[in-house]
UniProtKB/Swiss-Prot annotation:
Its EC number is 2.4.2.18. GO terms for cellular component: cytosol. The gene is trpD. Binds 2 magnesium ions per monomer. Pfam families: Glycos_trans_3N (PF02885), Glycos_transf_3 (PF00591). This is Anthranilate phosphoribosyltransferase. It comes from Prochlorococcus marinus (strain NATL1A). The keyword Metal-binding applies. Keywords: Amino-acid biosynthesis, Aromatic amino acid biosynthesis, Glycosyltransferase, Magnesium, Metal-binding, Transferase, Tryptophan biosynthesis. PANTHER family: ANTHRANILATE PHOSPHORIBOSYLTRANSFERASE.
Amino acid sequence: MTILNPITFPVILESLLASNDLTEEQSKFLMNSWLENKIEPVQTGAFLAALRAKGVSGDELSAMAKILQDASTTPSDLPSFDLVDTCGTGGDGANTFNISTGVAFVSAALGVKIAKHGNRSASGKVGSADVLENLGLPLNVSSGKVVEALKKLGITFLFAPSWHPSLVNLAPLRKSLGVRTIFNLLGPLVNPLRPKSQVLGVAKADLLDPMSVALKGMGLKRAVVVHGAGGLDEASLAGANQFRFLDKDVIRSEIIKPGDLGLTQISNESLKGDDLKTNSHILKSLLNGEGNQYHKEVVALNTALVLWVSGTEDDLSSGVKRALDCLNTDKSWLLFEQLRDFLAT
């Protein structure tokens, strides 16, 4: 009887088509092959389609993410203090304003060390990089400057394409496929500054478990994965939000409504953004203490999650209150201006 080598392209594809999860070795082999440009475009299309049809596992994600993170541009002088990243997988189609970007600056204004890892929009929605650039923040900055900003100001922004040069070859094919793939899930997992805590939003409830397992597999101390009411990849004011809380290798599930934390329940329509100009105006007003109440409340809700994962607050209600107090000042905007000016020099 002939025993097939399990680490070959045909065997891996057959396994995926049979709805079997890949082993750690197969996952790493596949990612390394992509990074080394050893997979033909037609094979890549088949693998990406098969992974999506099967449904990705948390172990597959963590194995691939570790390889991708190791291949990123990693500064030699990584900060010694613990960092937090806040982002979503995107793909919710809700066209909200840039909630997680606002959360990053409010959290940093409250003393959390934030390494925000982001990109331009791939779907017509305004991405974090788009809105920050429009407000004057330079994107193409040296890795040393990015880390220096973090040490000096407690917040920095990593423009993803500058830190993952090995993925350049895959970009045209991913775009031509026209559907979301495993790379949309890997992006939020591979911050090159290796934060020990993270708040991560998912647009589909069936991603809650694999993404929380992936974060655990990558060794994070604390994390929150959230699927917002109404399908947001952020905690929402629209109703019951589904959570996975990771703490000391234990993952627990919880459902939290806005009213549980003293917040207004209102539809996601109230959180709509629009074009780049509109989203930039919303973000600037919000950080300046001038945003509307619903914008403040949804940012406060998500900031409370950051305060929890960072160990700053153990109680979400207290975190919401601290965030709302901050959002009634211009502290977050002043911090943005400091980061913008520092990165521009």
